[in-house]
């Protein structure tokens, strides 16, 4: 039980650090939001932890960053991506790309629903088209931050296991 608690704390620490990275200046859409959802879904063994801990951390960081009209869709995407990766349970480039695509589709559908481009099929297509440059940054960020989270966690977890065994 102690090792499980240590693992939950270590995962939470990684999520807090990733959320803090949202507070530093960054290029548009180069943030660890999707990576946080991917990591928490893949690493927590309890779905309640996988959803609640990172959502609480995200809410706290959003208090400092600010909430936007699109926030509901961002959180919806976050929940869906977390569940997707909870079911997958591993880090693969395909899972990261699929998660990036899910975030892109859901968040930009939200932009369209909130009236950003007119309520027509052409407006929806324009919305997605205008978002493509941001999607490129998002994919790069998702690959970058996911890699750091997963490989950093693997090293830290090995270190934690060796420390607790001694």
Where are these regions (language model features)?
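Hydrophobic transmembrane alpha-helices
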Residues: 1-39
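Membrane-interface helix-boundary motifs at transmembrane edges
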Residues: 2-5, 44-46, 85-95, 158-161
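Residue-level signature of transmembrane alpha-helical entry/exit and packing/kink sites
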Residues: 7-11, 34, 50, 70-74, ...
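Juxtamembrane/disordered regions of integral membrane proteins
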Residues: 13-19, 56-60, 65-66, 89, ...
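Interfacial aromatic-anchored transmembrane helix boundaries in multi-pass membrane proteins
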Residues: 20-31, 55-87
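Generic transmembrane alpha-helix motif of multi-pass integral membrane proteins
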Residues: 33-50, 80-85
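Membrane-embedded alpha-helical hairpins and interfacial helices in multi-pass inner-membrane proteins
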Residues: 92-166
């Amino acid at each position: 039980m102690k090792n499980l608690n240590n693992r939950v704390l270590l995962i939470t620490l990684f999520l807090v650090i990733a959320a803090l990275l949202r507070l530093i200046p960054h290029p548009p859409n180069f943030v660890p939001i999707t990576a946080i959802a991917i990591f928490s879904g893949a690493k927590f063994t309890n779905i309640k932890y996988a959803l609640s801990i990172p959502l609480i951390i995200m809410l706290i960081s959003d208090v400092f960053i600010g909430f936007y009209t699109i926030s509901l869709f961002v959180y919806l995407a976050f929940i869906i991506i977390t569940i997707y990766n909870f079911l997958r349970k591993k880090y693969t480039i395909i899972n990261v790309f699929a998660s990036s695509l899910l975030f892109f589709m859901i968040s930009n559908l939200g932009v369209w629903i909130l009236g950003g481009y007119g309520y027509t099929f052409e407006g929806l297509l324009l919305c997605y088209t205008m978002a493509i440059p941001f999607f490129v940054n998002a994919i790069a960020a998702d690959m970058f931050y996911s890699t750091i989270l997963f490989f950093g966690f693997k090293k830290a977890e090995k270190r934690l296991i060796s420390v607790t065994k001694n």
